[in-house]
Amino acid sequence: MDFAFTDEQRMIQETAQAFFTENATSERTRAAMAGDGMDARLWTDFCQELGLAGVALPEDIGGVGLGMVELAIIAEAAGAQVSAIPMLGHVMVTQALAAGGSDAQRERWIAALTGGEAIAAAALEDDVAATGDTLSGTVRFVPHGALAHVLLIANGEGAWLVEAGAEGVAITAHTTMDQTRPMATVKLSNVASDPLPHPAAAIAAARAGGMIVLSAEALGGAQETLDRTVSYAKDRVQFGRAIGSFQAYKHRLADMMIEIEQARSAVYWAACAVDEGTEEA
């Protein structure tokens, strides 16, 4: 596999980095954390102005027609700024629709989701019981569950779409350590659902997309942490010298850089594997 970015990928990287650096400021992130955990304006601008919310979706269903590598590039840029946006659930649900949804389901949700008009969350839990297409059960720790308009429910045997406002759906928001990714408990009591016709493909695609987003966001955060630490080491003076000049400090920074580069290789290798459909994916 060739890990060198193409010109198009570099352009996406530069665009995403500039967008999140300018808009996902610490002040806006703190404001989101003090509220419901989401920067709604940032998400709307990302979807509508940047137009990359459907980057890894096929063009024939309303996407950009690129792949997981491009998605990872964007998620890395978002993670670098600790962006308070519902990208994880969005990617999991849209990937599930692309891989295992019906034409009607895609028509109902893809445009609304990629346009920022609706928010999605994924609840994958084996304890959810299905009687036909009626669902019951409780799923805990659903990212952005309390903000979602549509939920992807999957229990390993089937996958269903449930509208958050449907009868029998009770969602309780929780305060967690990472306030930029608020969690919720979703309780289903005899809830009518819309089954995806190809659940195995949908679940596999949702999990793959979710893991790419999570790992790329973490990579972006790690790289930004290192960059800021290096910058601080050049400015902070102790014993008459910049602390970055001390050998022990240099060694720690070098170790961190090596670990981040190893993580970067793993993230983009995984993204390439998904795009190419290899067995390792």
PLM regions and their residue ranges:
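Alpha-helical interface subdomain recognition
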Residues: M1-Q81, D103-A104, G116, A205-A281
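Structured catalytic cores of enzymes that bind and process phosphorylated ligands/cofactors
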Residues: Q9, Q17, H90, T94-Q95, ...
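Short, solvent-exposed polar/charged micro-motifs at secondary-structure junctions
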Residues: D39-R41, A99, A129-D133
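Short beta-strands and strand-loop turn motifs
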Residues: G54-L57, L88-V91, A121
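FAD-binding core of flavoproteins
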Residues: L66, S83-P86, Q95, A104-D227, ...
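Extended, compositionally biased flexible segments
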Residues: I74, M87-L88
